[in-house]
Amino acid sequence: MKIAVIQGPNLNMLGIREQHIYGNMSLEQIHQQLQTAAEQNGVELEFFQSNFEGEIVDRVQECLGTVDGIMINPAAYSHTSIAIKDALSAVNMPVVEVHISNIYKREEFRQKSITAAASTGVISGFGAFGYHMGLIALMQMINELKAIAQARNAQIQAQTEENK
């Protein structure tokens, strides 16, 4: 199982900026902890961070056929990017949107997430632990989709055998 972890603008400044909102862990520390949890569960992670909308769109599109799911923190682009929302919709795979802070307790302009409409689910307000929650959710969704596909294939094979 492979999951892309895509981080949006200013998340490279975690641990430095607004610690009262985002905590004191750096993005690298969050990734290290997430990597450890993934390895314990046999999951491969690919990490990506960009401050540029087009690069995030490109990375989402590159996920098609190469990963089983996406965990994304679009950061400020959550509230503005139809392009990222459209890219997430286009790849048609499990997507978990993660926000470190509770966007619903923040300024009004931060309380609407455009990208959430293309996400399977949203985790908001649990700090860095939200990424672990996202990993667990994605593993469960991906395993369920694989089980459904296997059952469907077994059913088709059984019907084919009956028709012989």
Swiss-Prot record:
Q: What class of enzyme is it?
A: lyase
Gene Ontology MF annotations: 3-dehydroquinate dehydratase activity
Q: Which domain of life is it from?
A: Bacteria
Cell cycle as a keyword of this entry, yes or no, is: no
Enumerate the CDD domains for this protein.
DHQase_II (cd00466)
Q: Active-site positions, per UniProt? A: 22 (proton acceptor), 99 (proton donor)
Q: Which reaction does it catalyse?
A: 3-dehydroquinate = 3-dehydroshikimate + H2O
User: What are the BP-aspect GO terms?
Assistant: amino acid biosynthetic process; aromatic amino acid family biosynthetic process; chorismate biosynthetic process; quinate catabolic process
Arranged from A to Z, the UniProt key words for this protein are: Amino-acid biosynthesis, Aromatic amino acid biosynthesis, Lyase
Q: Which Gene3D superfamilies match?
A: Dehydroquinase, class II
Where does the record place a coiled coil?
none
Q: Per the UniProt record, which EC number(s) apply here? A: 4.2.1.10
Q: What does the record give as its pathway?
A: Metabolic intermediate biosynthesis; chorismate biosynthesis; chorismate from D-erythrose 4-phosphate and phosphoenolpyruvate: step 3/7
Q: Tell me which InterPro entries the record gives.
A: DHquinase_II, DHquinase_II_CS, DHquinase_II_sf
Q: Where does substrate bind?
A: 73, 79, 86, 100-101, 110
Q: Does the keyword Acyltransferase apply?
A: no
Query: Sorted alphabetically, which Pfam families does this protein's record hold?
Result: DHquinase_II
- Kindly list the residues the record flags as site (Transition state stabilizer): 17
Give the signal peptide range.
none
Q: Which family does it belong to?
A: Belongs to the type-II 3-dehydroquinase family.
Give the multimer and partner information: Homododecamer.
Function noted in UniProt: Catalyzes a trans-dehydration via an enolate intermediate.
The protein here is known as 3-dehydroquinate dehydratase
Say which species the protein is native to: Aliarcobacter butzleri (strain RM4018)
Name of the gene encoding the protein in the UniProt record: aroQ
